[in-house]
UniProtKB/Swiss-Prot annotation:
Induction: Expression is regulated by light and circadian rhythms. Under circadian regulation, expression is influenced by the clock pacemaker genes period, timeless, Clock and cycle. The lineage of its organism: Eukaryota, Metazoa, Ecdysozoa, Arthropoda, Hexapoda. Gene3D superfamilies: 1.25.40.80, DNA Cyclobutane Dipyrimidine Photolyase, subunit A, domain 3, HUPs. Its cofactor is FAD. Coiled coil: none annotated. FAD-binding region regulates cry stability, cry-tim interaction, and circadian photosensitivity. One of its GO terms (molecular function) is photoreceptor activity. PANTHER family: CRYPTOCHROME (PTHR11455), CRYPTOCHROME-1 (PTHR11455:SF17). FAD binds at R237, S265, S267, Q311, H378, D410, A411, D412, C416, N419. It comes from Drosophila melanogaster. The keyword Chloroplast does not apply. This is Cryptochrome-1. It is found in: Cytoplasm; Cytoplasm, Perinuclear region; Nucleus.
């Protein structure tokens, strides 16, 4: 059948073929001879490429390669993902001139940082009489619908959010998989493709001047992106969930924190949209229901289960809080963030924290793991974030956010900024409270008693026995010589007196709290139990 134009499926964050309503919309006219053009555009910002480290870029490229491989496999080589470099409006205008576009279909990117990009394409579509189709599938609910249902304002507490989405109803089930076998694809003129900077094959991170950070030798896990990998990991994760449900645990990653084993988290694949959040949500809930029914047959009553996907709901909450707030990632102009007078940026302290050179082994191990792998256990994220802000260095959370956005595989703008505001007490129920500050030394002894994790990522301490590995400064000069770890030479001195810093910070928080007659509105949990469901809270404090 001769083509009568084409529909574009423009991949940005939803880097998958399953549960992709935008892809289904782009395929809806295939029986009328409308071809499909799958597109990804490196515009310097989309998919988090404005501030990106090597592991994040490699994960993105893996994900794009996986889409291309699946398209070619499903269509006997007729279909492929077209990966361009340039300005989206210009590329779509040129494509329209070449093949006449009927629709440009996208998965909604609800965060305000994408508004300008998407509005430029809406404007182009109006000008050229192209349908612009936007589908909600990166979130469980449309954040704008949540705000509308809540009376036009974002629900400031998690409990308010739960109440609002209960009014809306359960999130939609995943859509059917797209049938690509009988789809037609456009063959573009090679010279035209070159003029639009179409990659003949996917580039490497180095093409974008993105290089490794000299920590790769420490990597224990090399994460691989892509839908195929995401679905394999989902199967493994569901086995873990089932085992946990059958033992009465509903949040296995929080109930049994383990910083040593390979992580079972799906968050990186959710962040890039390699895994549908709706598929994850319903897979877990359907699994729990089946386990519950089998238990009932045996005469065992399984209660609870309301929080089995609590982390996904917190994700929705942060998206909703940010959707109408373009300043959500900073203090200035951010109405829900408390303006804590953090210390003037100290580049020496900041760089020591970024590179894992603080003199505190757990902090250093975690920060080096982040650089090497792009990953940190949830507990370690909270620990290094607290250390940077209210629990140690008294530096603004904005510095930590930018570092995480660059290196953390699963860091997205809304959720990462929300977490940083929360951990730093910039948006917290117990206003400006620093009474509980996790001690990185005590926590390390609890989570890593033999120093296995520390020695993996801080090899300077490889020969140090476990009684000193978490406090190497306690070694005598003779012991430092014996274990080949001279403090200040092989491993850095502590950059702060942590006990004094915590006391100073607590007083600063208390003083600021007393100065606020009317606390500003800020996103927050409704009670302490919600805090414990979100964080894994250590009960070891400075």
């Amino acid at each position: 059948m001769a083509t009568r134009g084409a529909n574009v499926i423009w991949f940005r964050h939803g880097l998958r073929l399953h549960d992709n309503p935008a892809l289904l919309a782009a395929l809806a006219d295939k029986d009328q001879g409308i071809a499909l053009i799958p597109v990804f555009i490196f515009d310097g910002e989309s998919a988090g490429t404005k501030n990106v480290g090597y592991n994040r870029m490699r994960f993105l490229l893996d994900s794009l390669q996986d889409i291309d491989d699946q398209l070619q496999a499903a269509t006997d080589g007729r279909g492929r993902l077209l990966v361009f470099e340039g300005e989206p409006a210009y590329i779509f205008r040129r494509l329209h001139e070449q093949v006449r576009l009927h629709r440009i279909c996208i998965e909604q990117d609800c965060e305000p940082i994408w508004n300008e990009r998407d509005e430029s394409i809406r404007s182009l579509c109006r000008e050229l009489n192209i349908d612009f189709v936007e589908k909600v599938s990166h979130t469980l609910w449309d954040p704008q619908l949540v705000i509308e249902t809540n009376g036009g304002i974002p629900p400031l507490t998690y409990q308010m959010f739960l109440h609002t989405v209960q009014i809306i109803g359960l999130p939609p089930r995943p859509t059917a998989d797209a049938r690509l076998e009988d789809a037609t694809f456009v063959e573009l003129d090679p010279e035209f493709c070159r003029s639009l900077k179409l990659f003949e094959q996917l580039p490497t991170p180095e093409h974008f001047n993105v290089y490794g950070d000299n920590m790769g030798f420490l990597a224990k896990i090399n994460w691989r992106g892509g839908e195929t990998q995401a679905l394999l990991l989902l199967d493994e994760r569901l086995k873990v969930e089932q085992h946990a449900f059958e033992r009465g645990f509903y949040l296995p990653n929080q109930a049994l924190p383990n910083i040593h084993d390979s992580p079972k988290s799906m968050s990186a694949h959710l962040r890039f949209g390699c895994l549908s959040v709706r598929r994850f949500y319903w897979s877990v809930h359907d699994l729990f229901k089946n386990v519950q029914l089998r238990a009932c047959v045996r005469g065992v009553q399984m209660t609870g289960g309301a929080h089995i996907t609590g982390q996904l709901i917190w994700r929705e909450y942060f998206y909703t809080m940010s959707v109408n707030n373009p300043n959500y990632d900073r203090m200035e102009g951010n109405d829900i963030c408390l303006s804590i007078p953090w210390a003037k940026p100290n580049e020496n302290l900041l760089q020591s924290w970024r590179l894992g050179q603080t003199g505190f082994p757990l902090i250093d191990g975690a920060m080096r793991q982040l650089l090497a792998e792009g990953w940190l256990h949830h507990t370690l994220r909270n620990t290094v974030a607290t250390f940077l802000t209210r629990g140690g260095l008294w530096q603004s959370w904005e510095h930590g956010l930018q570092h995480f956005l660059k290196y953390l595989l699963d860091a997205d703008w809304s959720v990462c900024a929300g977490n940083w505001m929360w951990v730093s007490s910039s948006a917290f129920e117990r206003l400006l409270d620093s009474s509980l500050v996790t001690c990185p030394v005590a926590l390390a002894k609890r989570l890593d008693p033999d120093g296995t994790y520390i020695k993996q990522y801080v090899p300077e301490l490889m020969n140090v026995p476990k009684e000193f590995v978490h406090e190497p400064w306690r070694m005598s000069a003779e012991q430092q010589e014996q274990y080949e770890c001279l403090i200040g030479v092989h491993y850095p001195e502590r950059i702060i007196d942590l006990s004094m810093a915590v006391k100073r910070n607590m007083l600063a928080m208390k003083s600021l709290r007393n100065s606020l007659i009317t606390p500003p509105p800020h996103c927050r949990p409704s009670n302490e139990e919600e805090v414990r469901q979100f964080f894994w809270l250590a009960d070891v404090v400075v």
